[in-house]
């Protein structure tokens, strides 16, 4: 997700090319939330202008959790069908509304049907620990991959159901080490596994790297370097049906490759894309053209009012000295969370946090309602 870096495709490309990235498969669902199909098209158009390959998966879920959130625009089967006609669209982005798939929501099923009719890949997102009948139903709906696994059993379960297991190392998610043992210890066929990032903040890209960071981490976790590279290159190309164009250094494929002095440490000495040297010794050599973004798309935060300190005060019922609060429990370096309850003090009618409990607010920014939750 390019937007997680708070960057445009051009600036994201400029950040990752020196780290050896020559192809990306992206899902711009954040821009879809804000600008709908037109925003996705602008992101896609800028992506297609870059000196490396940036392919787009059409976002599937805007909103991702219908009934629980509001978005500036909504995506449906009509938008998906339209996007499938664009050059460079490789499939449907992660199907986050997994309850909708499990319960045969017509909208979700139609989006996947439009994608499969175009002979393209349906991305998965099964963020539930239940690997029983609901999981089987989700896979039967059409999702062909998933990156929400956090344990070895998750990776094995996905591969057993015919999916490709995407193991991620992003800025906040560290799920490779806990899953790669499915290959290194259990001996599953590495062709069914893909290394990915999911979300990377710009600081991670600058200071730590991109896919080179993920490959190095996999090697550090005991993976054979060649298999780690396989899971970051040809496996991905095969998954998206592009192995005849890229993913290997072979005749007829795009001349995308890196030059490195060590396959174990993977220093990126030079980067070639489409036969041209685009980076050398950490320095970007290629130009990354920018799309001419209209002024209107730069002014999409519509709060409807000026925010005041009192908007973020949590009031308690009169007479209470403490209150039982619902708290989101963070699991370090994982996407799943825990549903917790804490007794928090009330002072002068206001709930106070203590210890490592923090306030959390949601400000509606699309429709100018002024709502702060």
Segments and roles (model prediction):
Residues 206-222, 226-373:
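Active-site microenvironment of metallo-dependent hydrolases
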Residues 1-3, 29-31, 59-64, 94-98, ...:
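Active-site beta-loop-alpha junctions enriched in small/polar residues
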Residues 1-13:
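Di-metal (Zn2+ and/or Mg2+/Mn2+) metal-binding site signature of metallo-dependent hydrolases
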Residues 57-59, 196, 361-363:
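Short beta-strand segments
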Residues 5-7, 27, 57, 125, ...:
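Structural motif
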Residues 20, 43, 92, 158, ...:
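Divalent metal-coordination and catalytic microenvironments
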Residues 74-94, 100-167, 174-195, 206-227, ...:
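Histidine/acidic residue-rich metal-binding segments in metalloenzymes
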Residues 10-121, 185-188:
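Divalent-metal coordination cores built from histidine and acidic residues
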